[in-house]
C-alpha cells in the first residue's frame, strides 16, 4: 500500500516549480491532490494531466490564497471533490528582491500578503477539516539563515513563516495535527530561468557555497515534503528542515 493511499492533499502554488514537483510526489505516493494556482491555469492543467496519466487523482483549482473567501473556496473544493482533507502544503510564494532604498509599501504588502497572510488563511480554512494525523507543511527558505543583501522583505516573510509554524505546531498538537517547515536552498525552477539566475555567475556562486556542490532540483524538495506528509513522520512536528545541500 502506498504511503499516502486514501489521503487528500492541497498544494498551493502548484502549477510549476517546487509546487508542481510536490503535487506529483504526493500523487505518486497515493494521495488525491488538489493543484492550486493563482493565474497559470495551463501549468496547473499540465500537472493534473501528468498525475492522471500516471494513474493518480488530481484536480486544478484557481484561488488567490491571500483572499480569505478564495482560500476557503479552495479547501471546500477539495473536500467536495474528494470527501476529506489530510495534508496542506503551503507553497505559494512571491520572491522579489529590492535594496532598502527601493522598498515600497506596495512591494512590502504584496510579498507579505502572499507569503504570510496566504499561509494563515489557507491554514485557517484547512484546520476546520483536518483530523487526527493531519499534516501541514510550510515551504520557507534558507534566507532566514543566509542573510542576503536586498532580501530584507522576502527574508522577513520567511522568518515570520517559521515563527508562525512553530506556534501552530503547538496550537494544533492537541488535535494531533502536525505542522512542519521545509526550507529549500537554491533550486533551479522556471522562476530562476525567467530571472536570469540559471546558468549565470550568480548561480555558480551559489553552487560554490553549497557543500554538496550542485544546484537543488524541485524533486529534492518534494521528497522531503512527501516524507513529512506521511505517517513515517508521525512523531515529527514543529521542525524546520533545511533541504539545501548543506547551506546554512
Swiss-Prot record:
PROSITE patterns hit by this protein: ADH_SHORT
Catalytic residues of the enzyme: 154 (proton acceptor)
CDD domains according to UniProt: THN_reductase-like_SDR_c
EC category: oxidoreductase
Keyword Lipid biosynthesis: no
Organism domain of life: Bacteria
EC number of this enzyme: 1.-.-.-
InterPro entries listed in its UniProt record: NAD(P)-bd_dom_sf, Sc_DH/Rdtase_CS, SDR_fam
Protein known as: Uncharacterized oxidoreductase MexAM1_META1p0182
Organism: Methylorubrum extorquens (strain ATCC 14718 / DSM 1338 / JCM 2805 / NCIMB 9133 / AM1) (Methylobacterium extorquens)
